[in-house]
From Swiss-Prot:
UniProt feature coiled coil, ranges: none
Organism: Bacillus mycoides (strain KBAB4)
Protein name: UPF0122 protein BcerKBAB4_3669
Taxonomic path: Bacteria, Bacillati, Bacillota, Bacilli, Bacillales
Function per UniProt: Might take part in the signal recognition particle (SRP) pathway. This is inferred from the conservation of its genetic proximity to ftsY/ffh. May be a regulatory protein.
UniProt record similarity statement: Belongs to the UPF0122 family.
Length: 110
């Protein structure tokens, strides 16, 4: 569950500008502010089921955006490559060719 929440938070950060105001509000309250479906429903004067349906549709939309734009995947790969580069730089014997390959891989992501 925590893994899904973390993924949704990342996807929301990357793609929130593509959502409607209502979708942004529901997702923000549910994932960032940790409100329950009932609390959100009460705040917007709608049913709990309406909030649930909206959040599920929005989650599916965020996954579709990620499938097409792969911003999260590129971000995670960039983080992995930067961590590897830092590790290589901290080692006593630098492997120049390997560092060049890591830098080239980072450049290709952009």
């Amino acid at each position: 569950m925590l893994e899904k929440t973390t993924r949704m938070n990342y996807l929301f950060d990357f793609y929130q500008s593509l959502l409607t105001q209502k979708q942004r509000s529901y997702m923000s309250l549910y994932y960032l502010d940790d409100l329950s479906l009932g609390e959100i429903a009460e705040e917007f004067d709608v049913s709990r089921q309406a909030v649930y349906d909206n959040i599920k549709r929005t989650e599916a939309m965020l996954e579709e955006y990620e499938d097409k734009l792969v911003l999260l995947q590129k971000f995670q790969e960039r983080q992995r490559l930067v961590a590897k580069l830092k590790q290589l730089l901290s080692e006593e014997e630098h492997v120049n060719e390997e560092m060049k390959q890591v830098v080239e891989a980072i450049e290709k992501l952009d």
